[in-house]
Amino acid sequence: MIKNYADIIPEVTELAKLCKNNTISPDLYTKYDVKRGLRDLNGKGVLTGLTEISEIISSKVENGVEVPCEGILTYRGINVKDLVKGFIQEDRFGFEETAYLLLFGSLPNSTQLDSFRNILGEYRQLPPGFVKNI
């Protein structure tokens, strides 16, 4: 049976609702002077911190002076090094868990992870004749 890759299955619709509830208040754009394009009027990159999806810490204050430090990258408040360490210790890849975390704001429980993996698996299959047509 040929899979229609444009089909939206009910599970995807439910997950999309989670993303819809994860929006940024329009008031915060004004409060923090965040522009809605990729650059502000001065050519600087826009602030991405409102999203709380990721944070990069690249400096610290020492004796009142901001100095570079070993960088820290967090996804949804979780240090990426800790995520990777867990994946390595438990001998798993972690792609699906990380994608779920970034999309929906928290790490999945085992039931959510199994469901998410199944959904991704359904859309991961190549259409018939793909390799032949390349």
Question: Predicted segment positions?
Answer:
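Hydrophobic alpha-helical bundle cores within soluble ligand-binding/oligomerization subdomains
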Residues: 1-134
